[in-house]
């Protein structure tokens, strides 16, 4: 297996959890050593503390060739308190309930993208107003299921027939939906202990970085995996005329415990 396997690999997310100092650098060294010869587009690192952020900035200074694909992901509290400012590509995660009453730090920072997590209609309205107020361009609104807000999901996430036809669906998209999962394909998640998951953190590990190289794990997922190639080929979707027009199965189906998230019965 040569570097061809890396053509399928689009993004690696590394959750460094409680790692600090040398242990953190060792994990990053191992990940980067294995993917540097490929064409990885995104190496996303989930950061929890200011000391981790400083360690990673030093690590990146010593690995300039990684600059083009490395991006940070952190909660708003850490980002807002970063005394150095954010100059690297970064995604800030913010719960709707944590939106500051005053100005939104980094609102004008072109390096920053946003993930706003919402649980209710009111939170969705608050976030939408914030986006309009600051004219944010790079953002994602992420509904969070908490076992009590199914009506919110039924209203805002579940599909109607009109949603499917709200924009043109190309033949390429239809064919893609028949063979791969567009939400999960090409994505790996690496835990601080080296466990590697394909497509989602909810999936079982497909191996461990310290025991198997990433190229082999990509091959395993392509030939044996159940995440990247998870399509709508089960009931009731397999009996629906809109089977390949709908988006691929997502984590929401797994969390909510339903094979489909729609109001369509055809």
Where in the sequence are the language-model features?
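A C-terminal junction/extension of Radical SAM enzymes
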Residues: 128-199, 245
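A general structural motif
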Residues: 9-11, 38-42, 65-69, 87-89, ...
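Structural motif
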Residues: 14-20, 44-52, 70-78, 91-100, ...
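N-terminal pre-core extensions flanking Radical SAM catalytic domains
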Residues: 1-58
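Acidic (Asp/Glu)-rich catalytic clusters
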Residues: 34-36, 58-65, 80-88, 101-109, ...
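Non-catalytic interaction/Regulatory regions outside core domains
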Residues: 96-101, 106-150, 257-266
């Amino acid at each position: 297996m040569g570097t061809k396997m890396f053509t399928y690999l689009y993004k690696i997310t590394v959750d460094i959890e409680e790692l600090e100092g040398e242990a953190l650098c060792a994990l990053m060294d191992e990940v980067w050593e294995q993917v540097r010869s490929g064409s990885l587009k995104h190496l996303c690192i989930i950061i929890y503390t200011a000391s981790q952020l400083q360690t990673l900035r030093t690590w990146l200074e010593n690995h300039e060739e990684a600059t083009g694909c490395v991006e940070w992901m952190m909660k708003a509290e850490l980002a807002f308190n970063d005394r150095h400012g954010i100059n690297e590509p970064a995604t800030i995660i913010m719960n709707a309930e944590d939106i500051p009453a005053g100005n939104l730090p980094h609102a004008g920072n072109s390096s920053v993208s946003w993930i706003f997590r919402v649980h209710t209609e009111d939170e969705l309205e608050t976030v939408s107003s914030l986006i309009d107020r600051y004219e944010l361009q790079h953002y994602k609104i992420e509904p969070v299921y908490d076992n009590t807000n199914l009506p919110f999901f039924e209203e805002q996430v579940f599909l109607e027939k009109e949603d499917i036809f709200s924009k043109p669906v190309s033949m390429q998209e239809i064919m893609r939906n028949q063979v791969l999962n567009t939400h999960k394909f090409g994505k790996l998640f690496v835990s601080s202990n080296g466990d590697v998951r394909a497509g989602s953190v909810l999936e079982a590990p497909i191996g461990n970085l310290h025991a198997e190289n990433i190229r082999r794990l990509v091959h395993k997922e392509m030939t044996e995996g159940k995440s990247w190639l998870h399509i709508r080929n089960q009931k009731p979707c397999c009996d629906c005329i809109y089977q390949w027009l709908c988006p691929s199965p997502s984590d929401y189906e797994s969390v909510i415990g339903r094979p489909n998230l729609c109001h369509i019965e055809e």
